[in-house]
From Swiss-Prot:
This is Heat shock transcription factor. The lineage of its organism: Eukaryota, Fungi, Dikarya, Ascomycota, Saccharomycotina. Residues 1-56, 115-164, 400-444, 457-541, 606-677 are annotated as: Disordered. Residues 400-416, 457-501 have a biased composition (Low complexity). GO terms for cellular component: nucleus; protein-DNA complex. Pfam families: HSF_DNA-bind. The keyword Nucleus applies.
């Protein structure tokens, strides 16, 4: 680098190559680097070969160019090197290739008029004394001198107050050894600490005072407790906070000790059960370094591969969760379906219950109507629709009730409440009644409406002669004793078949069945009458036709309460002076029957609309009054008395019994007109 006449101050220096260093011993003034005739640049200093031509110039030490004020960390650096770096130099410069040369003790910054010799070396005693304060400052034991602090320009004074710098090698020797605290902590942490129980057990076994209670075995591989009770009393309280031998054994097992079974244990030679011996492969006499391998065993769940430290497969859990969700949805769907089916079943049950109640009401009304039409014998008349037991019970209750009434009222018997089984053609259709059938049906079942019984107010003298022949056990009143002649006749009839006990006045089998079927077929208009007629007509005509023809054609008679003979045949018998109340009762009964028929037709139309839905077409077109009110003049009909041609009876017969089938409206209108008249 060539000479440069211009001198720049320290503040104006921007390029480190422009720094000029003196070589003739001149120092620095207060304003900066003093002017010099032959200054050298930084490059010349770094290349000492360029200065070999000048013989008058001393060779300074390269370490003197380092300003301690610019490199305060260089003294305490942990890893010093031969690199020079200042705040002015952006990058450090390696100085390994620089060859050291002798220089003056004052260094390149010494002043020319200084008393210090320029040939002083680093090995002089003065230099060594001068370096002591610097070493103290480097170690942090001293403070900078007051003289060095008095100069505000930051430069050292001349002479002995100047503190020269040390070489890099000496600085390495004087530097304090650096300790890596983080690395040392890591090494300390790797050292395994022994458990407190293991340390206590080691000191316990090796203590000579405890040799009587616990000691090493002969081989030194195990520890022996010769007397358990004394060990618990003498040793355990000194080392532990308890005196429980079971707890001590549990801790031994927890840290890997195992009980050693003695050869004599369990035999008859061993009388001492208090001796215990434990063994651990890392607990041996004289081998304390093995204690670091003794650790507390993990729990059984961890040893067996439990879920505490084991890795759980998340996919298995997700699959199981999806399966659970699917099953839950299926169960929810099944629950909804079951709930819906339950609701539907409840609705169907309620509907069926309502239908059952309505049908039961209709059946009850039908039974009441039939009972009102046929009277107390309705159970026998419509017996095909009932069970035989119920029919027997109803019939027996009728007879029993009327017999009790007749027995209580022997002085005045009501002829309307009398029931004659002999005169009733359907009395023995279902067989005779048994005593066990009595008293099983309440009275209200057959006493819904009283039956109309027509009576004869005059006594026939011709009928009294055959009274004893017509009377039987079924048609006499309870409480009256029959005459001796009648008792003999009854005994003779008991030996005969049951069908021979009928004494109904007909002239032939077919004629009898005409009268049997007429009250049923004409009243109900159903196949019930014809069924009985076809079923029993031929039977009676074949078996008992000849016998019944021998009987008289007159109707059956019966004694009254005052000796009066009453006729019980289903025919109207007129007298010389007919009673107007009789016709009024007959008219009332006919009106009631028509009202009942109309009510049943309305029920059937409401439940099952059919041909009678418009109200004009009758549902029972064959439902007429009994044919025995009509005088057809057939051979099967009994002869009517001479007074049957009375004008009132003829009018009743022509207007009521043989009128053509009319609509119910016309009948109702006719009823209203008759009632008004």
């Amino acid at each position: 680098m060539g000479h440069n006449d211009s001198v720049e101050t320290m503040d104006e220096i921007s390029n480190p190559n422009n720094i000029l260093l003196p070589h003739d011993g001149t120092g620095l003034d207060a304003t900066g680097i003093s002017g010099s005739q032959e200054p050298y640049g930084m490059v010349d200093v770094l290349n000492p070969d360029s200065l070999k031509d000048d013989s008058n110039v001393d060779e300074p030490l390269i370490e003197d160019i380092v300003n301690p004020s610019l490199d305060p960390e260089g003294v305490v650096s942990a890893e010093p090197s031969n690199e020079v770096g200042t705040p002015l130099l952006q990058q450090p410069i390696s100085l390994d290739h620089v060859i050291t040369r002798p220089a003056s003790a004052g260094g390149v910054y010494s002043i020319g008029n200084s008393s210090t010799s320029s040939a002083a070396k680093l090995s002089d005693g003065d230099l060594t004394n001068a370096t002591d304060p610097l070493l103290n400052n480097a170690h942090g034991h001293g403070q900078p001198s007051s003289e060095s602090q008095s100069h505000s320009n930051g430069y050292h004074k001349q002479g002995q107050s100047q503190q020269p710098l040390l070489s890099l090698n000496k600085r390495k020797l004087l530097a304090k050894a650096h300790v890596d605290k983080h690395h040392s902590k890591k090494k300390l942490s790797t050292t395994r600490a022994r458990p407190a129980f293991v340390n206590k057990l080691w000191s316990m076994v090796n203590d000579k005072s405890n040799e009587k209670f616990i000691h090493w075995s002969t081989s030194g591989e195990s520890i022996v407790v010769p007397n358990r009770e004394r060990f618990v009393q003498e040793v355990l309280p000194k080392y532990f906070k308890h005196s429980n031998f079971a707890s001590f054994v549990r801790q031994l097992n927890m840290y890997g000790w195992h009980k050693v079974q003695d050869v004599k244990s369990g035999s008859m030679l061993s009388n001492n059960d208090s001796r215990w011996e434990f063994e651990n492969e890392n607990f041996k006499r004289g081998k304390e370094y093995l204690l670091e391998n003794i650790v507390r065993q993990k729990s059984n769940t961890n040893i067996l591969g439990g879920t505490t430290n084991a890795e759980v497969d998340i996919h298995i859990l997700l699959n199981e969760l999806e399966t659970v969700k699917y099953n839950q949805l299926a169960i929810a769907e099944d629950l909804k379906r079951i709930t819906k089916d339950n609701e539907m079943l409840w609705k169907e049950n309620m509907m069926a219950r309502e239908r059952h109640q309505s049908q039961q009401q209709v059946l009850e009304k039908l039974l009441r109507f039939l009972s009102s039409v046929f009277g107390p014998n309705s159970a026998k008349t419509i017996g095909n629709g009932f069970q035989p037991d119920l029919i027997h019970e109803l019939s027996d209750m009728q007879v029993n009730h009327m017999s009790n009434n007749n027995h209580n009222n022997t002085g005045n018997i009501n002829p309307n409440a009398y029931h004659n089984e002999t005169d009733d053609p359907m009395a023995n259709v279902f067989g005779p009644l048994t005593p066990t059938d009595q008293g099983k049906v309440p009275l209200q079942d057959y006493k819904l409406r009283p039956r109309l019984l027509l009576k004869n107010r005059s006594m026939s003298s011709s009928s009294s002669s055959n009274l004893n022949q017509r009377q039987s056990p079924q048609n006499r009143i309870v409480g009256q004793s029959p005459p001796p002649q009648q008792q003999q006749q009854q005994q003779q009839q008991q030996g005969q078949p049951q069908g021979q006990q009928f004494s109904y006045p007909i002239q032939g089998g077919n004629q009898m069945m005409n009268q049997l079927g007429s009250p049923i077929g004409t009243q109900v208009g159903s196949p019930v009458g014809s069924q009985y007629g076809n079923q029993y007509g031929n039977q009676y005509s074949n078996q008992f036709g000849n016998q019944l023809q021998q009987q008289t054609s007159r109707p059956a008679l019966h004694h009254g309460s005052n000796g009066e003979i009453r006729e019980l045949t289903p025919s109207i018998v007129s007298s010389d002076s007919p009673d107007p109340a009789f016709f009024q009762d007959l008219q009332n009964n006919i009106d009631k029957q028509e009202e009942s028929i109309q009510e049943i037709q309305d029920w059937i139309t409401k439940l099952n609309p059919g041909p009678g839905e418009d109200g004009n077409t009758p549902i029972f077109p064959e439902l007429n009054m009994p044919s025995y009110f009509a005088n057809t003049g057939g051979s099967g009909q009994s002869e009517q008395p001479s007074d049957y041609g009375d004008s009132q009876i003829e009018e009743l017969r022509n207007s009521r019994l043989h009128e053509p089938d009319r609509s119910f409206e016309e009948k109702n209108n006719g009823q209203k007109r008759r009632r008004a008249a």
